[in-house]
């Protein structure tokens, strides 16, 4: 039955900002859905508040709204655009919740909009735990013993039945937010209190513990004629008790017998039938008790998910695209499989002749005080995927693709340490981010497979694989490089050993292993991901490396090629913005007739989609892997400036190996990043910088600090996302920093800068082609200098800076671009204090602001710069004028503090945000208000505000207090702030700080007295003292600001209505022309 003709236009709901548990896999699914539906001739309307996505590019949909995904805003869009249908299965939990809310509020009925892809009833049946349990019983499947609670009393009654340990999960939240495992009553009450607070329906599901059981997932697609296929089976390497998003996973499932697999396959199809999913993809999760084989259904998601992105990349089967077409009435047998060039229909189940491993990437080092043990609440921020012919090869490739400094199973503990065994046992039993390496250490320390199994519950089959690799490592260390004869080296490479790891084991340099491979002519071949285990010929070049005989790469010899190196796994400081740039580079160069080659290993992204580039190599972005691809493809140029720090780190080594790095030269990049060389350039150009020094010892630092003056910003050289960067206020602070943080720099020096307190920070993105410098955009930060630029909200155009100051910056950017010989993108950061412009830093590469600026101005910077790198001047492209839009765009960040209880949510020079949203308005206030709504802030228009500010802010706080009064707020203040306000004739209610007696601030926050808090501090002591204010505000969902500038922006936004007017990107850009 072909597509529906009763609908003409479809509204797709996006997933909003990137948060832990919902990352860029939804940009991938949303972008695919837009393409698939427009291909069928539908008018597509898209709403997504995240500007760093490909799906919000103006050419992806007919009308694109970068607006908050909030039912009232979406109602405005529906009223204006009048879609016939809404597709909510592409935007994760955010989109599902929004669709259900639109249904509940009667919006869909009011405007006659049909929900496609999933019915409200099916979503509710899958998400509502009680209905789900009843449905499973009906088809003869077991679920965990459980109960549902809406209050603490009910929860305790359920716990009495289920017993401890038990697992608590709030309904309608994602990434396991607010859930956890309770081993006793005290922990139980704490988790339930948090869960009741986070669940939009105030509902908790309390389950018997299945900890230690094996966990499996099935990716299923079903159409309305009841054709059902399993796209992929996924097995969790880690047992139940660790959220599947934080588990290492393997596809296809490795330890099921055929009979067990068939039982699970049939069960998952039965689940989709019963829940009523008949137009799209779902994932069904199972737990199996390894002792007796008891099978339990854990849950099902009636939408495209993180696992379906993984399954799509693992098999080459585009689940989101197929799901979008099924949603408009097609059946599986009517759709053709792209990868085989239409030789097979989409109703053929993919079969694969390789093994895929996914490993999550964590960022605990950014959250001092966070609990870094893995539980049922998801904490990872990204993931890496690797493909190999065996489990061992795929696992070792994934370990090196993770970019955490490991080249394979590098040891974590020294076996000479008397505490070694205790530490290993602790890490195995209570898993953290590095357990996989401790397993290898356990085998080195003499534990048996059973010994490790008893501590971890990881299937013995996986453990045997790791043990074998450890024994091989011992052999390499024993025989050294002379013992690496051709056959032995081939065996090692087949098992996924990296040159760098072998070099470390044999005690030689990596280059020597490479030389040895050249002597033996030992190189990888490339195999294709083709959905059919090489049964049919394939047109798409989607490749992975392995050490076998036959190479299927078949590179072209008649076309000019350009290779783009991606950014690897997402992490804080290097996220979707960089992937966005890589995709744009590929699209632009394809349009210009080049053959484009993408190298990346992140399964969540659009860059690793098989039709983004002409050729895709799903490989770790390391020197060894990239050089092997260059050897076979021989590209005319390689782009390293777009994937963040990952490919940049390789620039020099690639150049040294004779690889043509295009754009800004590695030497110019080094001139900008190396402190001393940069200093010389700045002095030549006579630009101002904050007083600074480079030091290599504690004593030297103490001396220099006296000359520069406190406060100081201290950091190691060469970092992204401000790792190990801090503001120190006195000598004791400085000494503590050197003792605790400086080990990051591996004998590299530490930089000291005088900290410009209260300066306004500004970001400028520009493109230089050697002749002309194009200013992409000047963004004024809302938080003052000292907050990492990636964590600060910003406005384009600037909202307080004078024209003169902006012109000074334009001139300085131009001088720097020419001095550093930039070819392509560059980003410059300035600080403005007392009308003086200070240069903070220059990055001759794509910055994380590029997507935001492109959306705000309508100039696709990443595309323009990619063409510049390939030799096309700005004049030839007709892009030489800076665009200053007639409206305001505000970028606001999203922070993951709710996942890390115990971490102080104070913003500082270390970047901690995971994602961003954008708000657009006729005024700064309207744009800022929209950005706040988009980032799920809890800003209220009136109520009671608490003011508690540091010495340096006391003059300006009077003005803020007056604005809040005018808005109708009642005011409270702490002692020092109250005195200043009193002198100005404003009399707030006085409140006690925590150590001044009760009722104090924290009591009042807990009692729900405040709707807004502003709390600014400086100095380590004051920061520690006021931490409980910030933590309580976060916990009780009170909107708070930790900078005075943020407070003023909030006060302005209170007058604006964020839900009143919606504007599409296409309408915005039309205003510019």
Curated annotation (Swiss-Prot):
Residues binding Mn(2+) 1: 285, 299
Annotated binding of ATP 1, by residue: 129, 169, 175-176, 208, 210, 215, 241-243, 285, 299
Binding positions for Mn(2+) 4 per the UniProt entry: 841, 843
Pfam family, any one: MGS
Residue span of region Allosteric domain: 937-1073
Enzyme's top EC category: ligase
Pathway: Amino-acid biosynthesis; L-arginine biosynthesis; carbamoyl phosphate from bicarbonate: step 1/1; Pyrimidine metabolism; UMP biosynthesis via de novo pathway; (S)-dihydroorotate from bicarbonate: step 1/3
Amino acids binding Mg(2+) 2: 299, 301
Binding-site residues for Mg(2+) 3, renumbered to this chain: 829, 841
EC number(s) stated in the UniProt entry for this protein: 6.3.4.16, 6.3.5.5
Cofactor(s) for this UniProt protein: Mg(2+); Mn(2+)
CC per GO annotation: cytoplasm
Amino acids binding Mn(2+) 2: 299, 301
Family: Belongs to the CarB family.
Free-text comment about domains: The large subunit is composed of 2 ATP-grasp domains that are involved in binding the 2 ATP molecules needed for carbamoyl phosphate synthesis. The N-terminal ATP-grasp domain (referred to as the carboxyphosphate synthetic component) catalyzes the ATP-dependent phosphorylation of hydrogencarbonate to carboxyphosphate and the subsequent nucleophilic attack by ammonia to form a carbamate intermediate.
Protein name per the record: Carbamoyl phosphate synthase large chain
Organism: Escherichia coli O6:H1 (strain CFT073 / ATCC 700928 / UPEC)
């Amino acid at each position: 039955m072909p597509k529906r003709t009763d609908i003409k236009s479809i509204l797709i709901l996006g997933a909003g900002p990137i948060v832990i548990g919902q990352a860029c896999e939804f940009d991938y699914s949303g972008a695919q859905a837009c393409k698939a539906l427009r291909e069928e001739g539908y008018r597509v309307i898209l709403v997504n508040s995240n500007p760093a996505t490909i799906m919000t590019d103006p050419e992806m949909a007919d009308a694109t709204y970068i607006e908050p995904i909030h039912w009232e805003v979406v109602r405005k869009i529906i009223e204006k655009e009048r879609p016939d249908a809404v597709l909510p299965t592409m935007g994760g939990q955010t989109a599902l919740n929004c669709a259900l809310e639109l249904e509940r509020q009667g919006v869909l009925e009011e405007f006659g909009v049909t929900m496609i892809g999933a019915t409200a009833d099916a979503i509710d049946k899958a998400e509502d735990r009680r209905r789900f349990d009843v449905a499973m019983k009906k088809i003869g499947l077991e679920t965990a013993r459980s109960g549902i609670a809406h209050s603490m009393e009910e929860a305790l009654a359920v716990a009495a039945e289920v017993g401890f340990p038990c697992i608590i999960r709030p309904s309608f939240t994602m990434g396991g937010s607010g859930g956890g495992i309770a081993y006793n009553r005290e922990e139980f009450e704490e988790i339930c209190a948090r869960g009741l607070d986070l669940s939009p329906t105030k509902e908790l599901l309390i389950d018997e513990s299945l900890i230690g059981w094996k966990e499996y997932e099935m990716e299923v697609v079903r159409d309305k004629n009841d054709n059902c296929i399993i796209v992929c089976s996924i097995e969790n390497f880690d047992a139940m008790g660790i959220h599947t998003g934080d588990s290492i996973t393997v596809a296809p499932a490795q330890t099921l017998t055929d009979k067990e697999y068939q039982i699970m396959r049939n069960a998952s199809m039965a689940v989709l039938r019963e829940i009523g999913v008949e137009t799209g993809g779902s994932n069904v999760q199972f737990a199996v008790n390894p002792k007796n084989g008891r099978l339990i259904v854990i849950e099902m998601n009636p939408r495209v998910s993180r696992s379906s992105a993984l399954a799509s990349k693992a098999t080459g089967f585009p689940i989101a695209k197929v799901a979008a077409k099924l949603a408009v009435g097609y059946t599986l047998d009517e759709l053709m499989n792209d990868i085989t060039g239409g030789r097979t229909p989409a109703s053929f189940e993919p079969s694969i002749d390789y093994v895929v491993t996914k490993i999550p990437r964590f960022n605990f080092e950014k959250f001092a005080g966070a609990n870094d043990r893995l539980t049922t609440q998801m904490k990872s921020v990204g993931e890496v995927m690797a493909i190999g012919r065996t489990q061992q090869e795929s696992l070792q490739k994934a370990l090196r693709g993770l970019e955490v400094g490991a080249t394979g199973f590098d040891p974590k503990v020294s076996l000479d340490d008397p505490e070694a065994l205790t530490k290993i046992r602790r890490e195995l039993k209570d898993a953290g981010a590095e357990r996989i390496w401790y397993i290898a250490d356990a085998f080195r320390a003499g534990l048996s497979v059973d010994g490790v199994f008893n501590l971890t519950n990881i299937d013995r089959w996986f453990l045997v694989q790791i043990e074998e690799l450890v024994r091989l490592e011992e052999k390499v260390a024993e025989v050294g490089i002379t013992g690496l004869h051709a056959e032995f080296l081939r065996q090692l490479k087949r098992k996924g050993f990296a040159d760098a790891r072998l070099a470390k084991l044999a005690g030689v340099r990596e280059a020597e292993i490479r030389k040895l491979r050249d002597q033996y002519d030992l190189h990888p071949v490339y195999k294709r991901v083709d959905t059919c285990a090489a049964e049919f010929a394939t047109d798409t070049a989607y490749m992975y490396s392995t050490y076998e005989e036959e190479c299927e790469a078949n590179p072209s010899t008649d076309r000019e090629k350009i290779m783009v190196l991606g950014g690897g796994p997402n992490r804080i400081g290097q996220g979707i913005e960089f992937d966005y740039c890589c995709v744009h580079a590929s699209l632009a160069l394809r349009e210009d007739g080049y053959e484009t080659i993408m190298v990346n290993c992140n399964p969540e992204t659009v860059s690793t989609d098989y039709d983004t580039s002409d050729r895709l190599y799903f490989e770790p972005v390391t020197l060894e892997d990239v050089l092997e691809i260059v050897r076979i493809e021989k590209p005319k140029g390689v782009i390293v400036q777009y994937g963040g720090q990952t490919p940049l780190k390789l620039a020099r080594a690639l150049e040294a190996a004779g690889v043509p790095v295009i754009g800004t030269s590695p030497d110019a990049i080094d001139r900008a990043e190396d402190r001393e060389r940069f200093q010389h350039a700045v002095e030549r150009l006579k630009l101002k910088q904050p007083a600074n020094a480079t030091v290599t010892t504690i004593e030297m630092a103490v001396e220099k600090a006296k000359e520069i003056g406190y406060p100081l910003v201290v950091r190691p050289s060469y970092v992204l996302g401000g790792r190990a960067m801090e503001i120190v206020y006195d000598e004791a602070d400085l000494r503590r920093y050197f003792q605790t943080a400086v080990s990051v720099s591996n004998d590299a020096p530490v930089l000291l800068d005088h900290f410009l307190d209260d300066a306004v920070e500004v970001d400028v993105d520009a493109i230089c082609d050697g002749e002309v410098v194009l200013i992409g955009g000047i963004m004024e930060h809302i938080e003052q200098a000292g907050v990492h630029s990636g964590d600060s909200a910003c406005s384009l155009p600037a909202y307080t800076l004078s024209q003169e100051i902006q012109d000074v910056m334009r001139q300085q950017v131009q001088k720097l671009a020419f001095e550093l010989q930039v070819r392509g993108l560059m980003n410059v950061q300035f600080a403005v204090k007392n009308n003086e412009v200070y240069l903070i830093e220059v990055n001759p590469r794509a910055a994380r602001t590029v997507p935001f600026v492109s959306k705000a101005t309508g100039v696709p910077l990443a595309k323009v710069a990619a063409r510049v790198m390939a030799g096309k001047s700005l004049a030839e492209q007709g892009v030489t004028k800076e665009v200053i839009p007639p409206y305001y765009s505000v970028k606001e960040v999203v922070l993951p503090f709710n996942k890390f209880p115990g971490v102080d949510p104070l913003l500082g020079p270390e970047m901690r945000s995971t994602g961003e949203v954008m708000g657009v308005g006729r005024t700064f206030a309207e744009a800022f208000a929209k950005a706040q709504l988009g980032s799920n802030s809890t800003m209220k228009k009136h109520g009671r505000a608490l003011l508690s500010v540091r010495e340096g802010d006391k003059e300006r706080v009077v003005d803020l207090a007056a604005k809040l009064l005018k808005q109708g707020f009642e005011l409270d203040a702490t002692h020092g702030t109250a005195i200043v306000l009193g002198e100005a004739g404003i009399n707030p209610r006085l409140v006690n700080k925590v150590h001044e007696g009760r009722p104090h601030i924290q009591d009042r926050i807990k009692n729900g007295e405040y709707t807004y808090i502003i709390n600014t501090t400086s100095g380590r002591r004051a920061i520690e003292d006021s931490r409980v204010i910030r933590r309580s505000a976060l916990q009780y969902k009170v909107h708070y600001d930790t900078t005075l500038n943020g407070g003023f922006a909030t006060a302005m936004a209170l007058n604006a209505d964020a839900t009143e007017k919606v504007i599409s990107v296409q309408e915005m850009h039309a205003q510019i022309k």
